[in-house]
């Protein structure tokens, strides 16, 4: 369990008082003649006086290059028309989610129509039965077939799809880790196909990169969702190459409505079981290797990262199957005896026993303080049910403070066994507000508003799904807390833009680009 409270860095914050700082003394005491000449120049003098920040400052002092503005790229490729929503705007998020759901449904249906025969051959006829059940297309005599057996079929089919995806990912990673001469024919073909996709992705990213400014945080956008999915999918389960509709594990599940059937029959919401359409580390690697080929071992790392997300989903469905369904059956039987209802139907009361509070579902839950809400907000990030972990990430942009803390496990019907460690969300939130109240940088009005906010519950602004693993999400949160250079790049522009950038850095991660400068060579030629 960990807790970190830290001051946030912004551009200009450190250089503002450069003349009287240790940095200024260091400049005067340690630089050589060449650097002195440079420092005495107009730009150099302005830098030392704290009027100009940037690469010049870091070159003279030998400090990190972090005070210069570089390209910061969000590690996500946005489809056409997509934008990162403001976390404090539920309406904006809701509209985006609905549009995305409709697009996915349409695309998944195309996959079902195109590959139905191959998919049912690979994963069994149960998929069609589940689909017909959801669409009300069951034959007359089958209308009253047992709902519990249909639920089990949906869970089993989903597990099959996830396991197939997991094993294919493992095969590709293994092929990439082998020497080229030791690969089998199948592995050579697999690697070649994957390389072609990476090249297509690299070209698309390169075109976007050329148009970027050396400014704040950038987003790679403009690829259509179909092309993106085909290009970024490591191992399509059915359909190969760069087809515009590939049957990924995610697409098959959506096409046959497995999660919807599970939710409709049991009340268990599995909408959090996702994997990233495009693994953030592959974008980071592509941005690093601009003019050279990406080594196989780097590609293997990205594939293994994506495999981790799929394995996490496998563990989650196994947890539902082994831990939750037996309890579900037991409660169902008890309910039948009490109510004297038909054997084939699941009573709604049974489903309600397995509903969990919205704020404990595995998502990023967004809250704001009741007063000064634009500046003071926090995220409560909850892991998959089988892990039963969560963390708190709070921001006060008024006084530039960030607070990260691992929280205690929470009890609900779908969780694992409890472990009494860590604090609750309420305790973390109150301490977070205490920081704002006691900070010397807080104005009297801000402190008074925070005292008022502490006495009441925060405002819940809704939830968002995350596609990466919980571990990756936690690493992103800790990087926001520790990495001063990243903070400088995301804390720029209007407040709503800063909040968007924070959310992007948490959900996807950010890659900061910037070529390293040879300081001795630069000073020699100054």
From Swiss-Prot:
GO terms for cellular component: viral outer capsid. It is found in: Virion. Keywords: Capsid protein, Outer capsid protein, Viral penetration into host cytoplasm, Viral penetration via permeabilization of host membrane, Virion, Virus entry into host cell. The keyword Translocase does not apply. Its main location: virion. GO terms for biological process: symbiont entry into host cell via permeabilization of host membrane. Residues 1-42 are annotated as: Involved in membrane permeabilization. GO terms for molecular function: structural molecule activity. It comes from the Viruses. VP5 protein is one of the two proteins (with VP2) which constitute the virus particle outer capsid. Acts as a membrane permeabilization protein that mediates release of viral particles from endosomal compartments into the cytoplasm. Permeabilization activity is probably negatively regulated by VP2 and is triggered by endosomal degradation of VP2 and exposure to low pH. Belongs to the orbivirus VP5 family. This is Outer capsid protein VP5. The lineage of its organism: Viruses, Riboviria, Orthornavirae, Duplornaviricota, Resentoviricetes. The gene is Segment-6.
């Amino acid at each position: 369990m960990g807790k970190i409270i830290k001051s946030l860095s912004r551009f200009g914050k450190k250089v503002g008082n450069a003349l009287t700082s240790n940095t200024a003394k260091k400049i005067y005491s340690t630089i050589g003649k060449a650097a002195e000449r440079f420092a005495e120049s107009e730009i150099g003098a302005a830098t030392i006086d704290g009027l100009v920040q940037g690469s010049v400052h870091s070159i003279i002092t030998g400090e990190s290059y972090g005070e210069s503005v570089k390209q910061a790229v969000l590690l996500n490729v946005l489809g056409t028309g997509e934008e990162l929503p403001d976390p404090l705007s539920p309406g904006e998020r809701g509209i985006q989610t609905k549009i995305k759901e409709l697009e996915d449904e349409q695309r998944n249906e195309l996959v079902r129509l195109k590959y139905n025969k191959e998919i049912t051959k690979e994963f069994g006829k149960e998929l069609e039965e589940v689909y017909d059940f959801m669409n009300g297309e069951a034959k007359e005599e089958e209308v009253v077939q047992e709902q519990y057996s249909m639920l089990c079929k949906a869970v089993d089919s989903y597990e099959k799809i996830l396991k197939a995806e997991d094993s294919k990912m493992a095969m590709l990673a293994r092929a990439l880790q082998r020497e080229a001469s030791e690969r089998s024919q199948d592995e050579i073909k697999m690697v070649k196909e994957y390389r072609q996709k990476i090249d297509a992705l690299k070209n698309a990213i390169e075109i976007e990169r050329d148009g970027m400014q050396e400014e704040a945080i950038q987003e790679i956008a403009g690829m259509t969702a179909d092309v993106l999915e085909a290009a970024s999918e490591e191992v399509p389960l059915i359909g190969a190459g760069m087809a515009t509709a590939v049957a990924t594990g995610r697409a098959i599940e959506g096409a046959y409505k497995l999660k919807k059937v599970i939710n409709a029959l049991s009340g268990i919401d599995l909408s959090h079981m996702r994997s990233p359409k495009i693994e953030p580390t592959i974008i980071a690697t592509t941005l690093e290797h601009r003019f050279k080929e990406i080594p196989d071992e780097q590609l293997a790392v990205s594939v293994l990262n994506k495999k981790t997300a799929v394995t996490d989903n496998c563990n989650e469905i196994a947890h539902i199957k082994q831990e939750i369904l037996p309890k579900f059956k037991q409660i169902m039987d008890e309910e039948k005896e009490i109510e004297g209802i038909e054997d084939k139907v699941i009573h709604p009361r049974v489903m309600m026993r397995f509903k969990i509070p919205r704020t404990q579902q595995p998502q990023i839950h967004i809250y704001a303080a009741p007063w000064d809400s634009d500046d003071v907000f926090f995220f409560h990030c909850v892991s998959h049910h089988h892990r039963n972990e969560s963390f708190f990430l709070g921001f006060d942009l008024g006084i530039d403070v960030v607070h990260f803390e691992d929280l205690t496990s929470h009890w609900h019907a779908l969780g694992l066994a409890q472990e009494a460690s860590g604090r609750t969300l309420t305790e973390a939130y109150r301490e977070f507000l205490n920081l704002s109240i006691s900070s010397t940088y807080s104005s009297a009005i801000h402190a008074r508003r925070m005292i008022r906010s502490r006495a009441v519950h925060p405002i819940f602004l809704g939830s968002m799904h995350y596609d990466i693993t919980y571990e990756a999400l936690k690493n992103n949160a800790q990087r926001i807390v520790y990495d001063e250079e990243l903070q400088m790049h995301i804390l720029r522009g209007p407040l709503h833009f800063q909040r968007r950038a924070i959310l992007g850095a948490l959900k996807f991660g950010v890659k900061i680009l910037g070529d390293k400068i040879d300081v001795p060579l630069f000073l020699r030629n100054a």
